[in-house]
């Protein structure tokens, strides 16, 4: 369990985190998203004790670790496993030795550390690669070693900082599936820092949007998607830009956000309203978190009927905007 209360961090008069409140229940996969400069990196450093907050508290598994130093801080850090964008493995060591390394540093006997590393090699699907050095491994395999290394101390929390942004789409899907499986098998809490909304759509149970050091929105993925007109939902379900239209084009364009119903129901409503849809200019429709969600942009020549359709859809709880 992770709880942040009023977390604030300033650097030479610049506010990186501005009073963040956040609670993540145990066993969830929670995404932290935001553009560059939103405060994601500073948040990570405060969570891991690499930065001391200017004010506020960080509670990890019931312990306020904000003021911890020395041995108490090192012990608290062992409850958090870190997975980075690049695994940063030691080139001189084998995959097995890289996984065992944090245990050896922590004072665990080498025989015990290597036994734990062998268990983790199997857990992350790298049997047969134990004696390979990093240069002999693919990017996805190196990331699996990094994940295994993060789990060496049996942490309760796995903190993943852009874990797939350096990988191709196929390998990304495999690594995300592995993280989800590890959560299911080990019961750990996973915090994923990412700018890739596809990662959130794929495996997150809940998500937080950071902007200018503030928590702009936190909710379960299903709650976010049930409000498809929200800022976060628009990020998760983007539409392509509208094509440039002729100044004399008299068609009316509606942007429709869908949650919990199909595109066919929208077209059925249009037909009953007598609205001649000229063109579907763009559409994004998919099933996420067990919910059919999407957005579409339609164009029609009948302004009056189109606006009547918009009102009908709005009455049914569907968000509709007239696009410029």
Model regions: which residues?
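The feature captures the beta-strand-to-loop junction immediately N-terminal to the Walker
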Residues: 33-35
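Conserved ABC ATPase "signature" region
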Residues: 63-64, 100, 104, 111-128
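Helix-to-loop junction immediately C-terminal to a conserved catalytic motif
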Residues: 48
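ABC ATPase NBD coupling module
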Residues: 65-81, 105-110, 224-228
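Conserved signature/switch motifs of ABC ATPase nucleotide-binding domains
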Residues: 132-135, 152-153
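Catalytic Walker B motif of ABC-type/P-loop ATPase nucleotide-binding domains
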Residues: 158-161
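ABC ATPase "signature
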Residues: 218-219, 227
């Amino acid at each position: 369990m992770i709880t942040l209360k009023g977390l604030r961090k300033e650097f030479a008069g610049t506010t990186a985190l501005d009073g963040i409140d956040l609670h993540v229940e145990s066993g969830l996969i929670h995404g932290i998203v935001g553009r560059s400069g939103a405060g994601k990196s500073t948040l990570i450093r405060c969570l891991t004790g690499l930065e001391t907050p200017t004010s506020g508290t960080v509670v990890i598994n019931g312990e306020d670790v904000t003021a911890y130093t020395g041995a108490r801080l090192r012990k608290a850090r062992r409850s958090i496993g870190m997975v980075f964008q690049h695994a940063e493995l030691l080139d001189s060591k084998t995959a097995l030795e890289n996984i065992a390394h944090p245990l050896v540093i922590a004072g665990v006997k080498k025989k015990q550390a290597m036994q734990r590393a062998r268990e983790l090699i199997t857990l992350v699907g790298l049997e047969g690669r134990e004696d390979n050095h990093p240069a002999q491994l693919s990017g996805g395999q190196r990331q699996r070693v990094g994940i295994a290394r993060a789990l060496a101390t049996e942490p309760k929390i796995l903190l993943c900082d852009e874990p797939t942004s350096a990988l191709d789409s196929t390998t990304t899907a495999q690594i995300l599936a592995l993280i989800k499986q590890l959560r299911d098998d080990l019961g750990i809490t996973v915090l994923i820092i990412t700018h890739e909304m596809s990662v959130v759509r794929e495996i997150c149970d809940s998500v937080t949007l950071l902007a200018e050091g503030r928590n702009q929105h936190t909710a379960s993925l299903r709650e976010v998607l049930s409000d498809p007109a929200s800022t976060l939902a628009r990020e998760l379900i983007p539409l392509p830009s509208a094509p440039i239209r002729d100044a004399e084009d008299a068609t009316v364009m509606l942007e429709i956000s869908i949650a919990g119903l199909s595109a066919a129901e929208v077209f059925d409503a249009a037909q009953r309203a007598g609205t001649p849809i000229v063109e579907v200019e763009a559409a994004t429709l998919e099933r996420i978190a067990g919910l059919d969600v999407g957005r579409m942009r339609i164009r029609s020549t009948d302004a009056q009927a189109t606006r009547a359709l918009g009102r009908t859809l709005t009455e049914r709880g569907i968000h509709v905007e007239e696009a410029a």
